[in-house]
């Protein structure tokens, strides 16, 4: 639904044709399920988050210790395209760093260089990097180097306009980051309200940062990768057992665990 949406005028009929043959559809969040229902999809739709294998991800950063002291760093890892709202990120970053002189802000990418389909954003980002030494752009990171960033930073920031769960939030919380995310799209389903800011509002975003920093509590966010790993296992369970009753791991975590334990115990 996400990337093919602009092609819906000719592709939707093809998708609905496949829908008639499918015994189930996996999506990350309830809002995605609702959008598919509105578009005419009739197959069972299971909300299973994204298929994160927590153990495999943790193995990529064997030095990670959740008890280690963390640095006063905000990490931003989303693409710099329009749907991620990067100009807003830059505005927030500049204001945040002005208010918090003991903090740094890292923008990361695994690419050899930063890319964007949004005109002007790369120039604006590098201009901010020149005038604000605590705003740092980091490119060509390996997965291990990225995970090392997450395991030492305190907060992952997001400004996306259309994410369905988001890999950034799952990987960040797996490695102990707290989060500041927009109260938008799929995020309110699983992120606590006190970590969500009013979309497009810089002042409210800064207040949310202040609250998250002051509380210093990421116990709620540690649940995200656990539930997502559970969702990955539920995908296998649903396929293996031809399970046609719709499941939502965000809402039925205990029931999903029960089904998996029941299967394991025979």
Language model segments and positions:
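Conserved acidic donor-binding segment of nucleotide-sugar-dependent glycosyltransferases
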Residues: 194-203, 212-216
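A charged, aromatic-enriched C-terminal amphipathic alpha-helix characteristic of glycosyltransferases
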Residues: 214-264
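Aromatic "clamp/platform" in nucleotide-sugar-dependent glycosyltransferases that forms part
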Residues: 160-161
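Short beta-strand->alpha-helix junction loop in the catalytic core
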Residues: 31-32, 47-59, 112
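Nucleotide-activated donor-binding/catalytic signature segment of Leloir-type glycosyltransferases, i.e.
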Residues: 119-141
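Membrane-proximal helix-turn-helix segments that form the acceptor-binding/catalytic region
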Residues: 3-25
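Conserved donor-binding/catalytic core segment of Leloir-type glycosyltransferases
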Residues: 65-84, 90-95, 106
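Glycosyltransferase donor-sugar binding loop
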Residues: 104-122, 139
């Amino acid at each position: 639904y996400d990337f093919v949406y602009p092609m819906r005028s000719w592709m939707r009929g093809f998708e609905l044709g496949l829908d008639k043959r499918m015994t189930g559809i996996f999506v990350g969040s309830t809002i995605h399920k609702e959008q598919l229902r509105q578009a005419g999809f009739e197959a069972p739709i299971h909300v299973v988050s994204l298929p994160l294998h927590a153990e495999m991800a943790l193995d990529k950063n064997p030095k990670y210790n959740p008890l280690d002291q963390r640095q006063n760093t905000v990490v931003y890892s989303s693409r710099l395209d329009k749907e991620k709202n990067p100009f807003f990120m830059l505005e927030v970053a500049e204001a945040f760093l002005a208010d918090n002189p003991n903090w740094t802000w890292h923008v990361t990418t695994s690419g050899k260089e930063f890319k964007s389909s949004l005109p002007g954003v790369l120039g604006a980002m590098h201009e901010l990097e020149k005038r604000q030494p605590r705003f740092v752009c980091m490119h060509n990171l390996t997965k291990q180097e990225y995970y090392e960033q997450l395991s030492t930073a305190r907060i992952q920031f997001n400004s996306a306009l259309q994410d369905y769960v988001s890999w950034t939030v799952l990987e960040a919380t797996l490695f102990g980051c707290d989060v500041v995310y927009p109260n938008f799209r799929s995020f309110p389903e699983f992120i606590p309200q006190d970590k969500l800011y009013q979309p497009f509002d810089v002042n409210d975003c800064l207040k949310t940062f202040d609250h998250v920093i002051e509380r210093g509590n990421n116990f709620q966010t540690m649940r995200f990768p656990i539930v997502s790993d559970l969702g990955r296992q539920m995908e296998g369970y649903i396929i293996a057992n031809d399970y046609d009753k719709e499941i939502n791991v965000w809402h039925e975590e205990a029931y999903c665990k029960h089904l998996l334990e029941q299967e394991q115990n025979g």
